Amino acid sequence: MLSVFVLPGGARAQTTTPQEWIEIGTRAHGGFGALIPIGIRIGLDALQRLKTSPRGVIVRYRSGETAPCPCVADGIMVATQASPGQGTLKVLDEKAGQGLLLDVEIEDRKTGATLRYRVASRWQPQVVTWNKTLDPLGRYQAVMAADAMIEPAGP
């Protein structure tokens, strides 16, 4: 089954509240587990650090050996508006390195500047706990407060 997700009129730019992210993430993914806000956080950070706008990036995503699914890619998609249909979001068959839950590269389409984000596998038990014990808003808040979770590298 293929789900199509469209943000009318560039809605992402105006979407700033946690509740709006939860609604969009749920619509795009079909649920709002803790992996979705991890992707949102990565996507927003990349747009800010690259000083680009939504649809201005190419995303290359790799899941780790123990990752349950590439759900984080859906969070990145809603934050950046990168899209498999546009060829700007690619979930690669190649796995992330040893000890990683995920490894993602986000490239500015105009400048070629690239950022890399990694989340260590040691975070997987915490993500599972958040999914079992917190509601969607609690998951969003927990991810946004977990400063050590996401390891960015690049410009």
Explain the meaning of each model-derived region.
Residues 9-13:
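Sec/Tat signal peptide C-region and signal peptidase I cleavage site
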Residues 14-32, 37-155:
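Non-transmembrane, aqueous-exposed alpha-helical and coiled segments at domain scale
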Residues 1-6:
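Bacterial N-terminal signal peptides
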